[in-house]
């Protein structure tokens, strides 16, 4: 499926490259935080592009600093637990790729539902 991320870079290099992810909720249909969770990445709290509406800096849904900080806290907590672990599995759980799951070597998993814009984190050993 086009929606299903099959990011071999994240699978192969997850435990040796820190790749920060934007925390923007671009629209009611796309939330970058979900991608950060799937990859076990680190968050950007505030990321301004060099030019407005370019370089990944788009005016999407406005999120308060308080909410952005809470979103970053969730991603940071996961990253702290998984940064040095292998990202051992990524799968699409639905045919259209709207629900995806990542699993780390200690059993920690993340399920993201892109249609409903929700996630579940289960921490391993």
Regions found by a protein language model. Give the residues of each.
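Active-site-proximal substrate-binding groove within the catalytic cores of carbohydrate-active enzymes
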Residues: 1-125
